């Protein structure tokens, strides 16, 4: 089995049955291997379209989207899609061909440092430097894309490694993503909720990404709390929920925006306080204490200082915050 065949084998092992791409010289061995079957390839007219299609596939299926491109202009055309996937927390694995290893750094035909270009718009980027590390890198790419806050990962594979043959062993890896449960902070948040007179729930796209919609709806059923959603959070709160105020922000409803400005406790769940929602940060929810719940520690206190920051799985945090109300 050569490297290109192993790439397709690794895709099948990850449960991938559809990829999006545009062929070119440096990735041609992988395209040859795709003829072996088991993975459907959908030809796009541009590599950016392939990246966007992979994003749409991931959104619609909950699986990791995969896009494929050649070296040079093929790889650079993926960048906009990778940046979109990073900002929207979409799991995508981008596989790019690269010039053969001896030619890297020589300004060879269609050689671009895609590893360097992609660092700012991916969770992680890999350059495969030997056939033997290909199984590990393919396994880690999918783990990194899906773990914690999801996002895009790029795997750059030189053409000579795609063509090299050898006996490769399967690699099984799982990224450790265990987060210590914030017991003290949860207790503090419970006390704030118990004292609040006008609490408000601010729901972002992280709820859906965490598959925490059922937990959120149970929390709302127990608290009868007014709720508003961001654009990406739409659908997390049922439209017929009696205390649902619609979308928040620049393009949101008057009711949602007025309510946030008057609340005394704002619970942000999987939301990031972006400018389309807040406008001027120093005038957003001016009377509110803030509880911020998110899987990504980088979002905590990034834009709005939280009185209590709860980092962790929303499926654990929401029931924990709700527990005293049940009792």
From Swiss-Prot:
Cofactor: FAD
One Pfam family of this chain: TPP_enzyme_N
Keyword annotations: Amino-acid biosynthesis, Branched-chain amino acid biosynthesis, FAD, Flavoprotein
A GO term for molecular function: thiamine pyrophosphate binding
Binding locations of FAD: 149, 251-272, 294-313
Domain of life: Bacteria
GO biological process: isoleucine biosynthetic process; L-valine biosynthetic process
Cofactor note: Binds 1 FAD per subunit.
InterPro entries: DHS-like_NAD/FAD-binding_dom, THDP-binding, Thiamin_PyroP_enz_cen_dom, Thiamin_PyroP_enz_TPP-bd_dom, TPP_enz
Pathway annotation: Amino-acid biosynthesis; L-isoleucine biosynthesis; L-isoleucine from 2-oxobutanoate: step 1/4; Amino-acid biosynthesis; L-valine biosynthesis; L-valine from pyruvate: step 1/4
Purpose: N-terminal pseudogene fragment of this gene. If the reading frame is restored, catalyzes the first step in the biosynthesis of branched-chain amino acids.
Assembly, per entry: Tetramer of two large (IlvG) and two small (IlvM) chains.
The family this protein is said to belong to: Belongs to the TPP enzyme family.
Further remarks about this protein from its record: E.coli contains genes for 3 AHAS isozymes: ilvBN, ilvGM and ilvIH. In strain K12 only the Val-inhibitable ilvBN and ilvIH are expressed; ilvGM has a frameshift that disturbs the ilvG reading frame. The ilv02096 mutation causes another frameshift which restores the open reading frame, permitting the expression of this isozyme and can be seen in entry (AC P0DP90). Restored IlvG is Val-resistant and is expressed in K12 strains having what used to be referred to as ilv0 mutations.
Identification of the protein by name: Putative acetolactate synthase isozyme 2 large subunit
Lineage: Bacteria, Pseudomonadati, Pseudomonadota, Gammaproteobacteria, Enterobacterales
């Amino acid at each position: 089995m050569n490297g290109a065949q192993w790439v397709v084998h690794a895709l099948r092992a990850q449960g991938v049955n559809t990829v999006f791409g545009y062929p070119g010289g440096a990735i041609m061995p992988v395209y040859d291997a795709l003829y072996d079957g088991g993975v459907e390839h959908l030809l796009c007219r541009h590599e950016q379209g392939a990246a966007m299609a992979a994003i749409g596939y991931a959104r619609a299926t909950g699986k990791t989207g995969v896009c494929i491109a050649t070296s040079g202009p093929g790889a650079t055309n993926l960048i906009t899609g990778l940046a979109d996937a990073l900002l929207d927390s979409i799991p995508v694995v981008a596989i790019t061909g690269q010039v053969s290893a001896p030619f890297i750094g020589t300004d060879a035909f269609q050689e671009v440092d895609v590893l360097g270009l992609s660092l700012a718009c991916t969770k992680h980027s890999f350059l495969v430097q030997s056939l033997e590390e290909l199984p590990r890198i393919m396994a880690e790419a999918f783990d990194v894309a899906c773990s914690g806050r999801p996002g895009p990962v790029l795997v750059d594979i030189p053409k000579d490694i795609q063509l090299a043959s050898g006996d490769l062993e399967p690699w099984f890896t799982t990224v450790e993503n265990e987060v210590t449960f914030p017991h003290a902070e949860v207790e503090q948040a419970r006390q704030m909720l118990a004292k609040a007179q006008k609490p408000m729930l601010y729901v972002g796209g992280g709820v859906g990404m965490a598959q925490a919609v059922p937990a959120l709806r149970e929390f709302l059923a127990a608290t009868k709390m007014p709720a508003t959603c961001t654009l990406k959070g739409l659908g997390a709160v049922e439209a017929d929920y009696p205390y649902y105020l619609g979308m928040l922000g620049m393009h949101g409803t008057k009711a949602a925006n007025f309510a946030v400005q008057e609340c005394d406790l704002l619970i942000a769940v999987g939301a990031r306080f972006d400018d389309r929602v807040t406008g001027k940060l120093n005038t957003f929810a001016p009377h509110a204490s803030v509880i911020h719940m998110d899987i990504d520690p980088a979002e905590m206190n990034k834009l709005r200082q939280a009185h209590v920051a709860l980092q962790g799985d929303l499926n654990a945090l929401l029931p924990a915050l709700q527990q005293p109300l049940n009792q």
